[in-house]
Design a protein with these regions (language model features):
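Catalytic core of pol beta-like nucleotidyltransferases
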Residues: 1-25, 33-39, 48-97
Length: 97
C-alpha cells in the first residue's frame, strides 16, 4: 500500500494486532487514504469491535514506524463530519471474516 506512504510491513503489523485484540474492522482515512499526505503525516485509523484501547496502545508501541497514529473508536459516538470522512475516503485495511 505504498501509495499511502505506509510500508506493507506496517500494514501487516496493524492487521496482526487487530486479530490479536479481536478488532473486527480497521479503516484508513485522512490524508494517507486520500494520497495528499506529507512525509510526517500521522496515520488515521478507525476501528470497531474488540479491545480498541489495547489495540491502539499496541499499534503505537509495536509497529515499525516512527509515524504517529490517531485512532477513532467506531463503537463510540463520533461527529457526523468525521463519519462522513471515514465513509467517503476510508480504505479498509482489515476486516474480520
Amino acid at each position: 500500500m505504498e501509495e499511502t506512504g505506509i510500508k506493507d510491513c506496517v500494514i501487516e503489523e496493524i492487521c496482526d494486532l487487530a486479530k490479536k485484540y479481536g478488532v473486527e474492522k480497521v479503516i484508513l482515512f485522512g490524508s494517507r487514504a486520500r494520497g495528499d499526505y506529507k512525509r510526517a503525516s500521522d496515520i488515521d485509523l478507525a476501528a470497531s469491535g474488540g479491545d480498541i484501547l489495547q489495540f491502539a496502545l499496541a499499534v503505537d508501541e509495536e509497529t515499525s514506524t516512527p509515524l504517529r497514529f490517531d485512532i477513532v473508536n467506531l463503537d463510540e459516538k463520533i461527529c457526523e463530519e468525521l463519519q462522513d470522512a471515514i465513509r467517503t475516503e476510508g480504505r479498509i485495511l482489515y476486516e474480520k471474516i
